[in-house]
Structure formats: C-alpha cells, structure tokens
Amino acid sequence: VHVLTEKGRGYGPASSHPERFHGTGPFDIQSGRPLAAKTAPTYTDHFSGAICSLAEKNKKVVAITAAMPDGTGLNRFRKKFPERFFDVGMAEQHAVTFAAGLASQGMLPVVCIYSTFLQRSYDQIIHDVNLLRENVVFAIDRAGFVPADGETHQGIYDPAFLSQLGMPLYAPSNYQELNYWLQQLLSDRFHGPRAIRYPRGGQDAALAEFGCTGEDYDFLRKVDDATIVLVSYADELADLLQAERELQQKSIACDVMKAVKLYPFTCKMVADLSKYKIILFAEECIANGSIGEHLEYALQQNGWNGRFIHCAVRNACLPHASVAQIKQATGLDAAHLVQAVQMAVTKGENLL
C-alpha cells in the first residue's frame, strides 16, 4: 500500500507554514503562534544577519540549505537575495555536490546545515569538495550538545570527521567571533573547503565578555608559574572557567586556553601548550578521532611527555535531555572537570 501524506493537512497554520510545525512547543490553536515569549537572539539569528551583510558586499556569495531555511536562519537571505538562495529539499548529498559545482564556476557557496544532517553528505564532502579543493564554506548549526531535539540531533561528530580531511575548522564562543570568522572565511584569505560551527541557542554571557581578538587561540585566564592548563572551545569554555574558579579555591592554579581554530593546529599553539605538565582538553565531541586526540598526538610528536586528560563523549548514544544534564552524564560539567584535575595532581604527587 502506497500512502501519500501531506504535512499539516486539515490545520491551516501548519499547511501554510509546514516548516514551523516540524517540531513545536505549546502554541495557540487558533493562530498557530507560539505561546512562549520570544527568546533572546541566538547564534542562528546573528549568522542570518552576518551572511546577508557579507552577501551585499560579495555578489559571488550564494546560500544553500536542505529543507531548513528557517532552522538555519536563511529566511532573511531568501527574501533579500532570491536569485542566490537555493533550497534543495531533503537532499544533503545534493546540497554539497551542487555547492561544489557552483564553486567550480567561480561562485562562493555557503552550505548552511545542522551538524547532525551534515553526516548524510560525508561522501560528497570527501569526493566532490575536498579532493577537488573546491571553494566551499560549511556553516554548521546545532554543533555540540543539542537539547530538546533528541538523540538524533546531537552535533558531536563533525569535528572528528572533518578534521580527518585536514579541513580548516573554526568554533566561535560568542557573537563577535562568529561575525569576524564568518567574514574571514568568506574572504580571499581562504581558498578551498573550510567550516565554521556554532551551537543552538545564544552566547554565554561570561564568554561574550572576552570579545574577539582575531587570534586562532587565546588565554582567558593566565597566572604566574601555572603548570596546568584547561583547554576547550565554544560553549564548553564556560564550564572550564567555572572549574578554574573552583580549583583556585582549592589552591590549584590553572590557565585557561580558548581554541577558535580547532584544526589544523598552529605550531605556536602546540609550543605554548608544551610548557605545561598537565593539560585537560574538554569538548562536546565523540572521543575517537576528536580534536583532543589530534592535539595529544601533535604534542607527543613535539616531544611533550606530560599528563593529558581528555574529557569527551565516550558513549555515542546520548539521552534526550537538557545540555546541563548531558554534560553531567558525559563528565563535561565543571564538577567532573575539577575532579579530573584533582586526580591528576594527586597522581603526580604520588609519583614524586
């Protein structure tokens, strides 16, 4: 039996705006409008404005999505540049190959896609974009832990599978960095495939205070003679800052490093980290093949023989839960990070 269904049939607001009813919270039955008050601006909102501004200056910029214009923040781009907006439907593989084709003809395509859906197009990323070194930018939304959307929407794989290709990968930790690095990635400074990833929701207030220096990495905390450094990227940095404060209260001095360029590493970053005896690297990413694994190898190749603590996702099946709950379950909350450092310090003292 072949049954043809129609999304939203029988309910006017859903038929008129099917993308809004893909997943819903409480809403008014008569109007279809959400009952919840409008939330603060998100990374997606800021990306939406930034890509429109950049497209005004560069006529070669085109935006591609796979049936997610609303979720990826491209509705504004679609209205402003209809001739440069392409929704290919639920066909992520085609989105990537289409982008490669446009790039081969001198355009600058930006593939706007959720991290979890980017997985569907990995073959095309390798063969059609990466091997040919096509000038394609990947804007990866919903990166890292994703609340509410469930187990299948966790953005925990893209750092691992993109770093295998040597693709430049950036992860802003606030809106200023998002705007700056998106501008850089769409400039002549880069050529070939590259990616920027950002989480669902808004920026962390504490991370926003650090602004954007334009550097590949920064120290958020620096103390004299520290032998321990905590390293991470994106939202996980907020937990590192909390862990650093708690460790300071326990008389354990730590520096905190923020990575913006996740891969490939710069020689200077590896050299700076080689000065420490204990390095804790935390990330909302699957452990195998992750940025942390690459970094540990790079340090060892540089002759470093200190203690490397890698806090990452060890179980690929994450629960449907809030970000705080997922971090607690995976050992990526501040309490677990503090415990990991304390254990490493104690072990080191026992070896003396």
Q: What annotation goes with each model-predicted range?
A:
Residues 2-23, 32-79, 87, 93-97, ...:
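Thiamine diphosphate
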Residues 28-30:
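Acidic/polar residues at beta-strand termini and the immediately following turn/coil
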Residues 106, 128-130:
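Acidic (Asp/Glu)-rich catalytic clusters
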Residues 107-117, 136:
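Glycine-rich phosphate/pyrophosphate-binding loops
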Residues 171-189:
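Conserved glycine-bearing catalytic or ligand-binding loops at nucleotide- and phosphate-handling centers
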